[in-house]
Amino acid sequence: MSIDFTLPPDQQKLQKIARAFSEDVLKPVVKEADLEPDTQKAFQMMKGPYKEAYKLGFAMGFLPKEYGGGGISNVDLQIVAEETTAVDPGFATILLVNGLGLMPVAWYGSEEQKRKWIGAATSDKNHEYLAGWTVSEPAGTPGGTANFDHLGVRPAGIGVVAELDKGKGEYVLNGRKYWPCNSGGWDLKGADVNVVIVRTAPSEGGKQGLSGMLVRAAPAGCVSSSR
């Protein structure tokens, strides 16, 4: 019995659109960005193609339709990822990280959070909304490199701690993150929203006592660096 892997007409159409975008819009910019020694400037050069990808529904298409997303399937998403990766894997990562940052809200957020955060992501009139995923950390004390299975004296995996300021009714995050995705935003002042994995129970290690915090762009006391 054979399996037919031929894409149906609608996905073939999507593939052609994604391929045309990658070849005609993305590739010329990638050639210039690859020559830029400053990594942040090279990242900023991707903003133009990103805005076009947003208009095509590639940046937020995986989000639920009821909150303004495209509600596309995993196969649709991978078609777009494959075509953009063929030209520049880094750009495909920018798109996919939006999912890492926003899908936890779609899965676990309250109705209010979904409408607030996902609604903002899918209705940006400037077509440049960026979500960040902030997990890994530099090794050291505190720190953990996001290795949840490491056994040591300090809590393993995540060293950034979030403490509740009861007076203000908000959490204060302390620590450093390393290799976060999209988190600096287009201008190193922060993505529109970052999902930051933190430890809310410092006495517990491994996978226990962890929480995901939604952090707005450029919160007080937060410094982003491309180095």
Task: Cite the ranges covered by each PLM segment.
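A short core secondary-structure module
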Residues: G169-V223
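A generic, well-ordered mixed alpha/beta core segment in the N-terminal half of proteins
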Residues: V105-T122, N126-V135
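Short acidic, glycine/serine/threonine-rich loops at helix termini
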Residues: S73, A106-G109, G143-V153, S183-D187, ...
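Long, well-ordered alpha-helical segments
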Residues: A18-P28, E112-K116, Y171-N174, G212-C222
